[in-house]
Amino acid sequence: MSKKEFTTQQVLELACAAQRVNGAYIKEEAPVYSEDGAFMYLKHTNKIQMLCTLEPAIWTADPKDAPMPLKVIPEDVAQAEEIRKYFRKFLFGAIEGENDFQTNINSILSSETVKQNQFGYVACLPSVHTRDIAQTNVKRASRAVEEGALAEIGSSLKDLDAEIISSIKSKNFEGWNIDAIINNKMVSWMNKTNLNLGACVIVKAKIKDCNKHWKHGNDVTRLHYVKAAQ
C-alpha cells in the first residue's frame, strides 16, 4: 500500500464522518439484516470508508460493493477539533511509552500528516472520545445522585424531564445503552436509536428493576418500554 500522507485534520474529519454514517466504530465488516432476518449487505469498516474516500483505487473488489465516498459536514469538522483538544489535554498529554496505542496517538495528533497505515488509529478516535466522555459523565453523576429507585418496580412513568449523560452503541445488541438523570436519580435503558447528550423528555416508560451500578456502586433504576423525545 502507498505511504501517501494526508493532513491529520482531514483524516480525523473523515473518521468523524464514518462514525456518523455507521453509527458506531466498526472494526470488521458487519452484516446487516432485514426485519425478517434476511441478509442484506455488509457494512463497511470505518477505516476502509476513509481510505476509499481519499484513494478510491484502493478498492479492488467488485466496484458495485465499494463504499460510498464520505461527505464531511460542519458537525464532523467541529467534532474533529474537539477530539484533538481532548486527547492532547486530558487523555494522553505528553506522556510517552505507556503502551503502543497511546504512543501512536500522541505521535499522530502531534503531527500535521497521517500515513495510510495509521488510519486505523484515527478511525477509532471518535468512538474512544465518546466512550471517555460518557464514562466521565457517569462517574461524576454517580457521586451526586440520590440513592433509591426512581419509582416502584412495575410502575409507569409519563412526561418526565431527563438529562442524557451517556449514549453508547451496544456491542451485543442493535441499540444504544442510555444512562440518564431523572429527578436526581440515575436511570438506564436500551434504546433503538442514539440519543444526544443533554435534555430529553421521557414521554413514557416503565420501571423494570433497580440495581447497583456495576462500577460505581450507586443505585440505578432500569427502565423498559421507553419512548424518549429530544
What are these regions (language model features)?
Residues S2-E35, F39-Y41, S156, L195, ...:
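Extended, charge-rich, solvent-exposed interface segments
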Residues A18-N137:
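Long, charge-rich alpha-helical interaction segments
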Residues S34, L42, S170-N172, I182:
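Acidic surface patches and DE-rich sequence motifs
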Residues P126-E174, I202-I207:
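Structural detector for short beta-strands of small beta-barrel domains
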Residues I133, L197-A199, W214-V220:
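N-terminal alpha-helical modules
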Residues K171, W189, K212-W214:
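Intrinsically disordered, low-complexity acidic/polar segments
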Residues E174-A199:
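Beta-strand/loop nucleic-acid-binding surfaces
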Residues N177-N183, K206-Q230:
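OB-fold/S1-family single-stranded nucleic acid-binding modules
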